[in-house]
């Protein structure tokens, strides 16, 4: 079985779409796929609703959480976002052309057994707690990603 890894660094809608389309395509072809979400890419995995965390966050971490998009449905475009208008137009065109949303692509990834891993160091820096992320996400550090990457024949950074 061929193995693919994707580092999802970006929290932009267009890049999240690319990452999940590639991951789902590889899984559909029978490949084992691991997606490692780090820094802004973690926003894709955030639950859309505000979550009360067990432990208290520091001021800067609370600020990060408040300023960043909460979940795949709130992501902006990397170019021509225009305060969210670009992303809204993109979602409309995608719907008209029957292109799956990021949320639908995440559901497909789960169904296909794609491993989604949140970077614990990035979570610490940004102040994200495990309960703030969607179900089915694993948690690991860079050593875990590197172990997976060593065994993969394709490693992408998006």
Set out the residue ranges of the language-model regions:
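N-terminal beta-loop-helix "entrance" segment that forms/cooperates
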Residues: 42-54
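Short, glycine-rich nucleotide/cofactor-binding loops
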Residues: 6-16, 45-48, 93-96
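Short internal beta-strands
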Residues: 33-39, 117-120
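A charged, amphipathic interaction segment
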Residues: 82-146
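Histidine-anchored nucleotide/phosphate-binding helix
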Residues: 17-30, 35
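Short, hinge-like loop/turn segments at secondary-structure boundaries
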Residues: 51-55, 134-137
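Extreme N-terminal starter segment of soluble prokaryotic enzymes
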Residues: 1-5
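A glycine-rich helix N-cap at a beta->alpha junction
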Residues: 53-86, 90, 98
């Amino acid at each position: 079985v061929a193995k693919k890894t994707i580092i999802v660094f970006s929290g932009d809608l267009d890049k999240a779409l690319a990452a999940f389309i590639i991951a789902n395509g590889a899984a559909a072809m029978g490949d084992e796929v691991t997606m490692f979400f780090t820094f802004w890419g973690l926003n894709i995995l955030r639950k859309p609703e505000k979550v009360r965390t067990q432990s208290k966050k520091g001021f800067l971490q609370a600020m990060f959480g408040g300023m960043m998009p909460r979940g795949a449905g709130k992501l902006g475009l990397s170019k021509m976002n225009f305060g969210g208008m670009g992303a809204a137009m993109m979602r409309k065109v995608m719907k008209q052309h029957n292109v799956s949303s990021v949320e639908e692509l995440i559901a497909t990834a789960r169904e296909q057994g794609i491993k989604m891993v949140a970077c614990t160091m990035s979570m610490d820096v940004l102040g994200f707690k495990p309960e703030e992320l969607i179900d089915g996400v694993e948690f690991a550090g860079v050593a875990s990603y590197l172990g997976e990457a060593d065994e993969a024949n394709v490693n992408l950074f998006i």
